[in-house]
Every structure is written in C-alpha cells, then in structure tokens.
Amino acid sequence: MWMLVMFDLPVKTKSQRNLANKYRHTLLDMGFDRLQLSVYCKYYINGNATGRDLFQLQIQVPPGGAVRIMKATDSQWAATIRYLGPQRKNIEEPPDALDVF
C-alpha cells in the first residue's frame, strides 16, 4: 500500500514559511519520500499501519493549510506513468520487506 500526501500550505509570512518547512521535515522524518515540493509518498507493507501516520499528519497541518491524502494499492501505483523531462521512466518499486524496517 502506498500513501500519497499532497498539500498547499500558506507561505506569505516568515512564520507560515517556517510551519510549511516544518511540515515537510515531519514528512521526511516519518519516512516519506519527496516526489515534488508539495507531494510525498510512503510505502506500507500493511495498509492497517497507515492509521498512526494519518493521525500525525492531521494534527501537524498548519493553520490555513490544505492537505489531501490518497492511498493506492501496489497495482494502482504500478499503473501510474512517470516522466523525467520527455523521457518515460519506471515508477518506484516497493522496497523489500527488510528495507522497510
């Protein structure tokens, strides 16, 4: 199971930028990989394990922030198309079970 986190956070003031950067660092600390500036993903061996992370992500959303979270199965993730420039690239493979721990 993959979890995709997409967000739009206010960054007009210095304190808003600090909170937005803190949210990005929180995602990285939780094991998410950055796909784009405001798009992160994480692989879960067990879909039930997402609950704890969902709660942490919810309580960390800065005021005025908009966050959308999508869960995708391995087959849904494998069906995505990825480009780097005009070149089509392979998508990320799920990590080996031992790599997750």
Task: Give the ranges of each region predicted by the language model.
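Basic nucleic-acid-binding interfaces
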Residues: 1-4, 9-101
